[in-house]
């Protein structure tokens, strides 16, 4: 990661075009056969995606195996941010289990920790966790998904700032933060909170149909297209993960 030029893979610049993913699939739940892991990653790649965020827990090892084989980059994410012995042990177990997977480009230590993400406690905890993580693996940047309060707390301390829904603070949010913290790399860990029903192009709330037109459904979120235009037009932003 480069704070001004984004992300580089094997020395070549690459814009991250990622997705957030829970570990479940229609019809089978979370206990997926290995072949379905391959199918999901191949399908995402066919859409043009090159990165996969494990939201919001460590994935099954078979998913990481598929990403290694097929060339999908990964954010590996711990379940709960914290500095207790139990929480640090969970982070350590994840990192020791997964660190030999070449697909992993970043460890995520948090997602939308609203109670602490915007204050000094969050910043101190981030530094403690980050320092601990680097005793296990120094080759990857630490990130966190942050949903606001980017001027304080976690966003002032983490290696790679993760913006969740920049509409919270206006489109100039990332530019302002980059000016104030020019040494921190950054990307969009969640953007584009759009709801759609496949093959449906009209709205019917009684049937819970939503038109498949990439329309923003929240006052706090852009459409995927709006979000991507922002992240793609700024060299310092490594890329974006669709929610």
Q: At which residue positions do the language-model features occur?
A:
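Active-site-adjacent substrate/metal-binding segments within catalytic domains
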Residues: 1-131, 142-143
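Short, surface-exposed connector motifs at secondary-structure boundaries
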Residues: 42-51, 152-160, 211
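Acidic-and-aromatic substrate-binding clefts and catalytic sites of carbohydrate-active enzymes
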Residues: 56-58, 81-87, 150-152, 164-172
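Short, hinge-like loop/turn segments at secondary-structure boundaries
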Residues: 70-73, 93-95, 158-162, 203-207
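Active-site flanking residues adjacent to catalytic metal/cofactor-binding acidic residues
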Residues: 76, 111, 158, 189-190
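Catalytic metal-binding/acid-base residues of hydrolase active sites
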Residues: 79-80, 110-114, 138, 147-148, ...
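Aromatic- and acid-rich polysaccharide-binding/catalytic face
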Residues: 102-105, 111, 148-168
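Substrate-binding clefts and catalytic carboxylate motifs of secreted carbohydrate-active enzymes
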Residues: 105-107, 124-135, 143, 154-155, ...
């Amino acid at each position: 990661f480069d704070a001004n030029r984004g992300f580089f893979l094997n020395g070549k610049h690459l814009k991250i075009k990622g997705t957030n993913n829970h570990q479940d699939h229609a019809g089978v739940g979370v206990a997926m056969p290995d072949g379905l892991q391959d199918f999901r990653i191949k399908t995402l790649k066919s859409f043009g995606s090159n990165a996969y965020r494990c939201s919001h827990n460590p994935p099954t090892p078979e998913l990481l195996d598929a990403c290694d084989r097929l060339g999908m980059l990964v954010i590996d994410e711990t379940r709960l941010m914290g500095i207790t012995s139990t929480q640090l042990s969970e982070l350590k177990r994840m990192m020791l289990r997964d660190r030999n997977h070449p697909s992993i480009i970043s460890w995520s230590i948090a997602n939308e920790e609203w109670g602490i993400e915007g204050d000094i406690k969050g910043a101190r905890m981030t530094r403690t966790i980050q320092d601990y993580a680097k005793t296990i693996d120094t080759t990857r940047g630490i990130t966190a998904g942050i949903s606001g309060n980017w001027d304080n707390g976690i966003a002032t301390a983490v290696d790679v700032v993760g913006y969740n829904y920049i509409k919270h603070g206006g489109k100039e949010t990332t530019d302002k933060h980059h000016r104030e913290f020019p040494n921190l790399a950054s990307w969009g860990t969640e953007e584009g909170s759009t709801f759609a029903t496949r093959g449906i192009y009209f709205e019917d709330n009684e049937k819970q149909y939503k038109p498949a037109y990439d329309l923003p459904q929240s006052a706090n979120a852009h459409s995927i297209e709006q979000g991507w235009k922002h992240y793609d037009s700024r060299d310092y932003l490594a890329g974006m993960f669709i929610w």
